[in-house]
């Protein structure tokens, strides 16, 4: 049976609860959590009004969430409400936390995010991972995870799960890296290398960047392409508020769209791929600069100082991005293209030629292009928030674990 194109990974948002009385209770617990997180602090009466349940039903649900440590009472509701004040409810700053991790070509990063959405702990290790076997890299990542978990536990948090962003194709088991050309990893089961006690999800870094934009960006954004870059380039396709994964889970490999079929060879085996013109190292080569260290900072600094070689290289990269994106825009008709990752820091020099190319080539009106506020932090935040969303979407999944 073919997998659904929009299917979410097991710990991601979107898992369907059963159509039973127990399933209805679990959905209502989730509705309470989302209402309080979005609009809180709220009284029980205000929650009932928001979600359309009786006060008695909401009170029962709230009591269960308080016992589970997911909600807390703050005292009288804030001023400005009509009628008798009730006890204000807020999402707890203690209890479950989402642990997000990122394996980059030249860094490892881990963070802990509480149910309120606040980052409570973070650790980063800079250094190349290219060409290194997965085992040593993941052991270093596991050490960072333990460091962040220990720091979070001192804050009264406990890990509800671990989500790992990687620069490559991930199988639908949400743990196996099928292929990561820029790391030279193939068929690597990260689940066998990471702490077994934490529920694990592995996904492409571009997908997690897109989910960060969906969950943390403009609340009206429901149909967009989120394009991010490091050495490679990936895209998350969000349609009607859901991530489009494709049959095998490989949707969004924008970096391997050929923009010049007779161009240079790519590590993927193709020729003339977008990455060979708009990836960080490709732009550095075109500008005559040596790769190393903060590649984006180096390019941005030279461009800001008027280096014509760098500006020309970025202009050409924007043109290549525009060519590759034209097909996606014509095919999917998104509301917006969002530049994230390294592209956000280079947007002032990429946008003019990118937007010109889109305007010239798209069949309909020009597609708006925006810059993500999360930049290179998007994949890490999206990974951590995927665990948080899983708890908010099914609070009973962590009942008894506090």
Regions found by a protein language model. Give the residues of each.
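Short glycine-aspartate micro-motif
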Residues: 88-90, 98-102, 110, 159-163, ...
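General beta-strand structural signal in soluble alpha/beta enzymes
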Residues: 73-75, 199-204, 237
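Glycine-rich phosphate-binding loop and adjoining helix at the ATP-binding site
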Residues: 119-225, 349-360
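AAA+ ATPase active-site-proximal loops
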Residues: 207, 233, 339
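Short, acidic, Ser/Thr-enriched surface-loop or helix-capping motifs
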Residues: 114, 171-172, 238
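Short helix-capping/turn signature of helix-turn-helix
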Residues: 38-39, 216, 229-230
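ATP-binding/phosphotransfer module of carbohydrate and carboxylate kinases, centering on a glycine-rich
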Residues: 1-124, 130-151, 155-158, 262, ...
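Glycine-rich phosphate-binding loop of actin/hexokinase-like ATP-binding domains
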Residues: 220-277
């Amino acid at each position: 049976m073919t997998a659904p194109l929009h299917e979410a990974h097991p710990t991601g948002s979107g898992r369907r609860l059963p159509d039973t009385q127990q399933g209805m209770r679990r959905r209502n617990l989730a509705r309470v959590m989302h209402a309080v997180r979005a609009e809180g602090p709220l009284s029980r009466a205000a929650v009932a009004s928001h979600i359309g349940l009786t006060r008695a039903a909401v009170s029962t649900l709230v009591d269960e969430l308080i016992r589970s440590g997911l909600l807390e009472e703050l005292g009288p509701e804030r001023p400005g409400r009509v009628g008798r004040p009730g006890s204000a409810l807020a999402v707890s700053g203690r209890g479950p936390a989402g642990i997000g991790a990122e394996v980059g070509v030249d860094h490892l990063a881990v963070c802990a995010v509480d149910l309120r959405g606040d980052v409570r702990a973070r650790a980063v290790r800079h250094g190349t991972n290219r060409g290194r076997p997965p085992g040593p890299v993941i052991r270093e990542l596991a050490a960072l995870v333990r460091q962040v978990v220990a720091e979070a536990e001192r804050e009264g948090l406990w890990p509800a799960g671990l989500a790992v962003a990687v620069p490559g194709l991930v199988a639908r088991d949400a743990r196996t890296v099928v292929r990561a050309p820029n790391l030279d990893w193939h068929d690597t089961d990260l689940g066998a290398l990471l702490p077994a006690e934490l529920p694990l999800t592995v996904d492409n870094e571009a997908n997690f960047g897109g989910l960060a934009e969906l969950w943390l960006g403009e609340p009206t954004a429901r149909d967009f392409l989120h394009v991010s870059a490091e050495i490679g380039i990936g895209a998350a396709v969000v349609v009607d508020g859901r991530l489009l994964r494709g049959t095998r889970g490989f949707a969004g490999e924008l970096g391997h769209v050929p923009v010049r079929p007779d161009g240079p060879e790519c590590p993927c085996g193709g020729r003339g791929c977008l990455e060979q013109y708009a990836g960080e190292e490709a732009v550095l080569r075109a500008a005559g600069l040596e790769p190393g260290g903060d590649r984006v900072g180096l390019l941005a600094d030279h461009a800001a100082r008027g280096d014509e070689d760098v500006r020309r290289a970025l202009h050409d990269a924007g043109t290549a991005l525009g060519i590759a994106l034209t097909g996606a825009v014509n095919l999917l008709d998104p509301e917006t293209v969002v530049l994230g990752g390294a592209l956000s820091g280079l947007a002032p020099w990429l946008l003019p030629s990118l937007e010109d190319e889109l305007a010239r080539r798209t069949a309909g009106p020009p597609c708006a292009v925006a810059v993500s506020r999360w930049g290179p932090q998007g994949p890490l935040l999206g990974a951590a928030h995927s665990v948080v969303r899983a708890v908010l979407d099914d609070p009973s999944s962590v009942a008894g674990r506090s």
